[in-house]
Amino acid sequence: MNLHEYQAKALFAEYGLPVSEGFACDTAQEAVEAAGHIGGDMWVVKCQVHAGGRGKAGGVKVTGDKEEIRAFAEHWLGKNLVTYQTDEKGQPVAKILVESCTDIANELYLGAVVDRSTRRVVFMASTEGGVEIETVAEETPELIHKAIIDPLTGPQPYQARDLGFKLGLNPTQMKQFTKVFMGLAKMFEDHDFALLEINPLVITDEGNIHCLDGKIGIDGNALFRQPKIRDMHDPSQDDAREAHAAKFELNYVALDGNVGCMVNGAGLAMGTMDIVNLHGGKPANFLDVGGGATKERVAEAFKIILSDSNVKAVLVNIFGGIVRCDMIAEGIIGAVKEVGVEVPVVVRLEGTNADLGREVLANSDLDIIAATSLTDAAEQVVKAAEGK
C-alpha cells in the first residue's frame, strides 16, 4: 500500500522531521485559502497521486499568484494525471497539496528499503538528488552510499554520520541529518514500511536540511496491525480489477498482453508467464488463485481476467497439491458457464486427481482445450490468442 505525499509528510512531522507547512485541499477555494493561511509570497501546488514524474506532466506548479493556484486546482481536481509511471489512463487527482516555497541550495537523496538479499533494512543516500535513483544506480552506482540496519542493535548515529561525511555535510548539517536518519529509521520499523524515499532531501539557502518530498510504501501483510496507516488507504489510486481481486483473496496484477493467466501459486504463476513469453505470447495479467481455490474464486478470477478487453485467450494452469484437480475442473466448467466465456480456454492440470480432472473437462460440452504439458499449454494458448 502506498501513501500520498501529504500523508507521508504528516508522518514526518510527527517524528520531528523538517517539512514545509502545507495543506491537502479538496477544492480550488480551499487551495487559495491554504495559501493565505501559510503566508509568504510564493507557494508550491502539487497534484496528489501515487506516481512519480508529476512535475514533467504538469502536476506541480510554483507560483506567487493565488489566482494561478485556483486555476491549477480547478484544472486538475477530478481529472486524471498521466505520468511515465502510470498507464495511459493516469491516476485520478482528488487532492491538491499547497505548500510554502523552499529555497534550494543543493539536492540530495535519502531512501530505505527492505533488502531481501541481506534480510535487513538498508538506507541509501546520494548527492544525486532530484533524479530517479534507478538511473543513478545504473549509470553511477558509486554515488550511492548505503547503511545496513542491524535488527538487534537498531539504527546507530554513527551510521548517519558516515553517510553525512560521504554527502559532504558540514557539522551543523550533520546533526540535522542524523536526526532525520534516526527518525526515519524508527518510523520505518514502527509502521512496517517496505519503502521510503525523500527525493529530494534538500539543503536550503540557509544551510538547513529539509524534507522536500516524501514517498512511502507499506508492507501490505502488516496492515492488520497498522490501523492508523490502513485508514490512509486511497482506493481511487488502485487498479479497479486489482482492488476487486483483493476482496476475494486473489493476487492479481494487470499487465498489457493478450493472454489471460489463472494459476495457483505465485511461483508457478511467474513460471507460467515466463513460458508464455518464451513461446511468443504476452501475459495480460498475473493472477494467483491461491492454494484454497474454490469454484467461487475461480469464477471471480475469470470475471476479472475477462474484464480486460485485450484478453484473447485464457490459460488455466493448476498443480493439485492442496487442492484436487477434479474439483478445480468442475469449478472451471461452472465458472465458464456462469461467466459466459467467449475466448478460447486452455487448461493444464497436474497433481492430485489430474487424470480425473482432465476426464471431467473432456466430458463437458464446453470448448475447453486440455493441454498435456506446460509447454503444450503455452503453445496452444499463444496460437489461440493469435486466432490460429
Swiss-Prot record:
Transmembrane segments: none annotated. Its cofactor is Mg(2+). GO terms for cellular component: cytosol; succinate-CoA ligase complex. It holds the Pfam family ATP-grasp_2. Residues 9-244 form the ATP-grasp domain. One of its GO terms (molecular function) is ATP binding. ATP binds at K46, G53, R54, G55, E99, T102, E107. Belongs to the succinate/malate CoA ligase beta subunit family. Heterotetramer of two alpha and two beta subunits. Succinyl-CoA synthetase functions in the citric acid cycle (TCA), coupling the hydrolysis of succinyl-CoA to the synthesis of either ATP or GTP and thus represents the only step of substrate-level phosphorylation in the TCA. The beta subunit provides nucleotide specificity of the enzyme and binds the substrate succinate, while the binding sites for coenzyme A and phosphate are found in the alpha subunit. NCBIfam families: PRK00696.1, sucCoAbeta. This is Succinate--CoA ligase [ADP-forming] subunit beta. It comes from Shewanella pealeana (strain ATCC 700345 / ANG-SQ1).
